[in-house]
Structures are given as C-alpha cells and as structure tokens.
C-alpha cells in the first residue's frame, strides 16, 4: 500500500468510510522535517540571515503508532505559519527541547522525542484511522485541524483548555505535524472541512483565524461588540486580515494600519474604510533604539480621531510588540483594552504606565484558542462569513522556499502547501456556495 492508493480513495466519488477503514496504511510517508543534529547550523548569524531553505528537509519517515483519542489524517494541504519559520531557524530556542520534555510525560508521548521534528500546525485532509475511545470521527471524514494539543488531566484546563498545564501547539511543541502526507492529531483537534473551499484554502485559516477569534471576539480576549473602534496593526497580514474581517462582520469599526498602498487596497477590498499607511505618513514611534517619542503617539492619536469622528480606540489588536506597544497604550480610550498575542518586533515592551493605570485601561495576553473558539472560528469560515486569505501555494518540495518567503515577509496573507493534493483547486463539495463567495475567496490571490 502506498500514499497513491490513499489519494485514489480520496479522489474517488464512491469511497465509503468502510473503504477508508479497509485501506492498509503505508509503512512510511514524506514529511517536512528539521534535524536535531543541525540545531547549531546558524550559530552566529543574525535572525534575518538564517535561511530556512538550508534547515528544512523532505524526508521519508515511518508512520507513528496510533494512541487513544488520536487520529491519523491523510493531509491534502497545509500552510506555513511563523512558528514553522521559528522552528526552521532554531529561534528563540530549538523545538527539540519541547519534544524532549513532552517525551518524558508518558510512554505514549515518548513517540514525539525523535532526532527529527515533523513540523506544521495546519492541515486539511481525510481521516484514515482513529484510536481507541474515538466516537465523533471516522475514516473518510473530510476535516481541518486546529493546533491546540492538551492532556486535560489537571483541573486547571477544564474552564479554558488553553490553561491546561500540558497545553502545547501541535507541529511546533509536538511532533508529527501537518506539513506532511500523513499527520497524527488528537481527535479533539478535528473540525469539519468547509465544503465550498479547496483543500489548500481550507488548510490556510486554521492557526491565524483561531488566534484572531480568541484575541478579538471571545470573552477570553477583547469581547468585541458592535460599534467598537478596533485598531488593527498589520491589518492585511496573516493575523490582521482575519481581525479586520471579524471586526467588519461583527459591526465594529476597524482602523487598519498598513505599510504600503497595496496593503491599504487589500483592506479596502475587505470593506474597511479607515486606513492608515504608517510609512506614507511617516510615523516613527522611537527616536532611537532606547527612546520613544510621545509626540508621535499624539500625532498618531490625532489621525485616528480624524478617521473615527473624534473617538478614541476601544480595542487594540496588538502583535508587533516593542515597536508599537507604547503607541497602542497611549491611543486606547479610557477603560479600553489592548490585546496582545505576539511580539514580532521585540519582546521587551515599553509604555508610559500613567496612560494605563490612570485611565483604567487593560492589557490582555492572548494565545491561540481553545477547541470551542477554534470551532466557532472555523464555523464562520464554513458559513462564508469569514474568508481565507491564501495568496500563494507551494508544493511540498518547495516548503523551504515558502518558509523563506514568510521569514523575509515576501508574502501577503497566508501561503499554502500542497501535500497529497496533486494540484490546486481540488476538494470543493459545494460549488454553488463557492460561486457566491468566489471574489472574497480570491481576494489575496497573487498579491
């Protein structure tokens, strides 16, 4: 049995769940990996100069053992997130430390501690096998997966699974990720594939869509409501493009910050009206690497009020971090909220605390999403309320180049990777719904 036999079954219109269950699994499959013996290959280089094309490998690897509550999924398509870039350049730490720690948890998790790491935190594909105790999913189900992996043996995670002490990001802090022909997931990561999308379109939203949903919409994040003024940094990017869509769909007013006229046009195409091109308007929030410029915060706040009819910001959707955080705290209205999920420009934030405490503002840390939040975010995709931001698709062999392009910010929105799917455009099950939303689905294509 080969992966081609699996692909033939997936592409057959007549294959049943029993047919998929009867398929023999191959002994091995192709997967994107990094190697433990190469973690020092970029020592001494600046982050920008570390090249994922040198560290990312396409290897033939054995199919992992299937455990209770797990599934093996034939991966038709995946995508590249920043965590795969971090893994490939071994920053801020090597992910093999995560695998070693996870491997010590139980005899079953020891499978993850290997000299290679199969990466990737998104997938769209078809269930091949389920382990003991699985009732909700069966072979042949077309699925996407979110990337929250939890053990839930502690009481801490039963109010919000993101608080589970053994919470991990699949394909980053665990092995057997989605940039492969077969992936191993927990079945509480699975969600129905949106029927109107292709495999590569369905795979793309996962991590970033769920992250944006929790950070902006969920009660665990900013709990956005109708009429809120929402400042969105990087509003046309992988995270920001979903935040912009959520704000528009939820009746809020997104104030989109971008860095070029092209990116401003993408925001307009999504329906945004209030847009700030920070490069064109010359905002420099730091005089030098040690000193911020409050005058620039004030100029930025004045521009925001011009766009909102004199109102300040209710919610800031933060992820750049050090470069923008002082400005974010300043421009937020009294009693407003700054939510942060990343620090792409630097982890050590500085802000004037007087503008926080004396104005009763809140800073909320937000990290990925729990199963309910991820499911709700995917449900909005499936209903055509939120749309993929896929701009380009690579082959599995080209994953190194895809990661390089993301690392160097040469992309827009999300970039996809075909795994088992032989070409783009496959997997659509609801052509009528697709036709209704085709312009929005293709909004980021070839940008």
Swiss-Prot record:
**If you read the UniProt record, what top EC class would you report for this enzyme, in one word?**
oxidoreductase
Show the catalytic activity: butanoyl-CoA + NADP(+) = (2E)-butenoyl-CoA + NADPH + H(+)
Q: Pfam families of this UniProt entry? A: ADH_N (PF08240), ADH_zinc_N (PF00107)
Summarize the thermal behavior of the activity: Optimum temperature is 40 degrees Celsius.
Q: Which UniProt keywords apply?
A: Metal-binding, NADP, Oxidoreductase, Zinc
EC nos: 1.3.1.86
Q: Which GO terms describe its molecular function?
A: crotonyl-CoA reductase activity; metal ion binding; NADP binding
Q: What does the activity regulation annotation say? A: Inhibited by divalent cations (30-100%), beta-chloromercuribenzoate (85%), iodoacetamide (40%) and N-ethylmaleamide (80%). The presence of CoA thioesters containing 12-20 carbon atoms results in inhibition of enzyme activity. The greatest degree of inhibition is observed in the presence of palmitoyl-CoA and myristoyl-CoA. The branched-chain fatty acids, isopalmitoyl-CoA and isomyristoyl-CoA are less effective inhibitors of the crotonyl-CoA reductase. Concentrations of NADPH above 200 uM lead to inhibition of enzyme activity.
List, alphabetically, the CDD domains matched: crotonyl_coA_red
| Transmembrane stretches, start-end | none
NCBIfam families to which the protein is assigned, alphabetical: crot-CoA-red (TIGR01751)
Protein family: Belongs to the zinc-containing alcohol dehydrogenase family. Crotonyl-CoA carboxylase/reductase subfamily.
Question: Subunit details for this protein?
Answer: Homodimer.
Q: What is this protein called?
A: Crotonyl-CoA reductase
Its source organism is Streptomyces collinus
Show the taxonomic lineage: Bacteria, Bacillati, Actinomycetota, Actinomycetes, Kitasatosporales
Gene name on record?
Answer: ccr
């Amino acid at each position: 049995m080969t992966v081609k036999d699996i692909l033939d079954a997936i592409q057959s219109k007549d294959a049943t769940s029993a047919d998929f269950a009867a398929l023999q699994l191959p002994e091995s499959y192709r997967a994107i990996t990094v190697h433990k013996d190469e973690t020092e290959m970029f020592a001494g280089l600046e982050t920008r100069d570390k090249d994922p094309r040198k560290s990312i490998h396409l290897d033939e690897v054995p199919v992992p053992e299937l455990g209770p509550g797990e599934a093996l999924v034939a991966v038709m398509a995946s995508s590249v997130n920043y965590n795969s870039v971090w893994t490939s350049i071994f920053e801020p730490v090597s992910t093999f430390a995560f695998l070693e720690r996870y491997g010590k948890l139980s005899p079953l998790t020891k499978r993850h501690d290997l000299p290679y790491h199969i990466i990737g935190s998104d997938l769209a594909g078809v269930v091949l096998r389920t382990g003991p105790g699985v009732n909700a999913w069966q072979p042949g189900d077309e699925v996407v997966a979110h990337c929250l992996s939890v053990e839930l043996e502690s009481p801490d995670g039963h109010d919000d699974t993101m608080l589970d002490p053994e919470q991990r990001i699949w394909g980053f802090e665990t092995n057997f990720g989605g940039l492969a022909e077969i992936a191993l997931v927990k079945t509480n990561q699975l969600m129905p594939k949106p029927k109107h999308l292709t495999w590569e379109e369905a795979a793309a939203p996962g991590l970033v869509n769920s992250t944006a949903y929790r950070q902006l919409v969920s009660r665990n994040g900013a709990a956005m409501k109708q009429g809120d003024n929402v400042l969105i940094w990087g509003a046309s990017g992988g995270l920001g493009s979903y935040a912009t869509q959520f704000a528009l769909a939820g009746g809020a007013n997104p104030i989109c910050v971008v860095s070029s006229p092209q990116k401003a046009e993408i925001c307009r195409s999504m329906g945004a009206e209030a847009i700030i091109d920070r490069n064109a308007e010359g905002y420099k929030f730091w005089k030098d690497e040690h000193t911020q410029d409050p005058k620039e915060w004030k100029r930025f706040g004045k521009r925001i009020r011009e766009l909102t009819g004199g109102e300040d910001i209710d919610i800031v959707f933060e992820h750049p971090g050090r470069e923008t955080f002082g400005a974010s705290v300043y421009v937020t209205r009294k009693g407003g909220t700054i939510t942060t999920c990343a620090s792409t420009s630097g982890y050590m934030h500085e802000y004037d605390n007087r503008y926080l405490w004396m104005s009763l503002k809140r800073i909320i840390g937000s990290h990925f999403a729990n199963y309910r939040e991820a499911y709700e975010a995917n449900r909005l995709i499936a209903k055509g309320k939120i749309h993929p931001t896929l701009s380009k698709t690579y082959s599995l062999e080209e994953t190194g180049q895809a990661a390089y392009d993301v690392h160097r910010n040469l992309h827009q929105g999300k970039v996809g990777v075909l795994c088992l799917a032989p070409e783009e455009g496959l997997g659509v099950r609801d052509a009528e719904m697709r036709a209704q939303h085709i312009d929005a689905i293709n909004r980021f294509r070839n940008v």
